[in-house]
Amino acid sequence: MGWLGSGVLLWSVAHLLKRVAPTWRSRMGGAGRPLVALSIIGSVVLMTLGYQQVDGPVWWVRQSGLVGINNLLVLVGFYIIASSLTGAHITRFVRHPQLTAIKLWAVAHLLVNGDLASLILFGGLLIWAVLAVVLINRQDERPVREQRPIVWVREMGAFSAAIVIYGLVGYAHGMLGYPVHG
């Protein structure tokens, strides 16, 4: 459990550093970017290795009815992330699209995984994403969203990217022994 918890903590600190210690982070200047990047890479390694090693209690098991909801939430999360990159219309209504996608992803995984490792990983990242949104909202003014027409190329690009990413991630899950469809 130590590696997994350390990975989630390192991820959170690396991402929140700018918000909780802005003066210290700004003093680091450009030299701090590689350190933050290495911290994030290290956190992913720790979370991946740690998740596989945690052996603990299971509070609930996967219910077949929730698998479809899980998959839909993950797909919507991928769409929101892709939309943030393509400028699709939904981003006019979602202030923090990437953090919103992480929250959807975490909740989706908590619906179908009630083991200790999942609670630490997905619960920890959910807490981080909620905290990040709160800190950003306190520090930054709400941006004025410009009225713009829907550009269907962007919409289809985001939708297509979400489907492709969902398929690739689903395939990788299966290869790693975590099937997404039951």
What would you call each of these model-derived segments?
Residues 1-95, 100-182:
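Membrane-anchoring alpha-helices and their flanking helix-loop junctions
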